[in-house]
């Protein structure tokens, strides 16, 4: 198992790229790589800036999360500005990711290059619904204790960030981790949160559920055969939310597990077993 340490005024690398840093007023840990993230702790309700842009605010406990997408540059400056004018900042080195190619054949042509006008109109409606759901911004820090895998048993069949070729046609990168499992396997919430979307019959995703874990950190569960939650519902870590299926664009029963922080696609597997820093900063 990988461990992380928090060392004052320094960075620590302890196995597999797990990093931690602490400077007065700001503690960080996480996976600082493309597709990775940083958990942070600072002053309660401090504004958090990434490369000079205000993107989130710390919770009442001073906790926050930021993400680094597949194309993130080689560094990121994290700055916290407390309610009383105090500031703290760190610059993180973001490691490059390694993204293999994945070839998928045997998909219905309508799910790869749809041309039917009615279908295209339906896809546009579904994109709008998903976009709205991904704007969910629940206050709080349900991510603070990290994440579990959503399935008890599974086999990883496609890595996050891989460049896909579908029926011989190059497609956008795959922003999910595919977990093959028997049809009907129980999908469980990997962390506490609120359901931002629960919809069956999506053209590409089939049965789709989104969970908001706070501050714009949202996980997605695709291709479900059954959904057991409703939009707006609070869920707890380990609670059953649905069943594995092969609905939408899928060639076999599996769960496509995704994660977004605001508009950035993250690798959910990197967050499994991570916890936010425990250092507490009180207001001066």
Indicate where each model-derived feature is located.
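N-terminal export signals
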Residues: 2-21
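Ser/Thr-rich low-complexity repeats and stalk/linker segments
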Residues: 21-97
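Solvent-exposed coil/turn segments that connect beta secondary-structure elements
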Residues: 53, 69-71, 83, 95-97, ...
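Surface-exposed, glycine-biased beta-strand/turn segments
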Residues: 91-205
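Short, well-structured beta-strand-loop connectors
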Residues: 186-197, 228-244
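Zn2+-dependent peptidoglycan hydrolase active-site motif and core
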Residues: 190-225, 253-258
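Extended, charge-rich intrinsically disordered regulatory tails
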Residues: 235-253, 257-284
């Amino acid at each position: 198992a990988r461990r992380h340490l928090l060392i004052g005024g320094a960075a620590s690398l302890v196995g597999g790229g797990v990093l931690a840093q602490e400077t007065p007023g700001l503690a960080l840990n996480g996976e600082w790589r493309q597709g990775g993230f940083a958990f942070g702790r600072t002053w309660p309700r401090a504004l958090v800036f990434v490369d000079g842009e205000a993107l989130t605010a710390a919770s009442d406990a001073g906790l926050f999360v930021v993400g680094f997408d597949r194309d993130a540059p080689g560094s990121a400056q994290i700055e916290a500005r407390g309610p009383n004018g105090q500031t703290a900042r760190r610059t993180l080195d973001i490691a490059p990711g390694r993204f293999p190619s994945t070839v998928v054949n045997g998909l219905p042509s309508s799910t790869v290059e749809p041309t039917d006008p009615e279908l295209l109109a339906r896809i546009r409606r579904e994109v709008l619904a998903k976009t709205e759901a991904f704007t969910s911004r629940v206050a709080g820090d349900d991510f603070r204790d990290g994440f579990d895998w959503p399935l008890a048993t599974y086999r990883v069949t496609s890595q996050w960030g891989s460049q896909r070729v579908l029926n011989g046609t190059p497609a956008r990168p795959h922003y999910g981790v595919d977990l093959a499992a028997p049809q009907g396997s129980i999908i469980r919430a990997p962390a506490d949160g609120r359901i931002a979307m629960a919809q069956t019959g999506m053209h590409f995703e089939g049965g789709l559920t989104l969970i908001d874990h706070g501050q714009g950190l949202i996980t997605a569960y695709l291709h479900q055969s059954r959904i057991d939650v409703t939009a707006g519902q609070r869920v707890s870590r380990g609670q059953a939310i649905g069943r594995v299926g092969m609905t939408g664009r899928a060639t076999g029963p599996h769960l496509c597990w995704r994660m977004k922080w605001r508009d950035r696609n993250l690798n959910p597997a990197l967050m499994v077993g991570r916890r936010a820093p425990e250092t507490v900063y009180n207001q001066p």
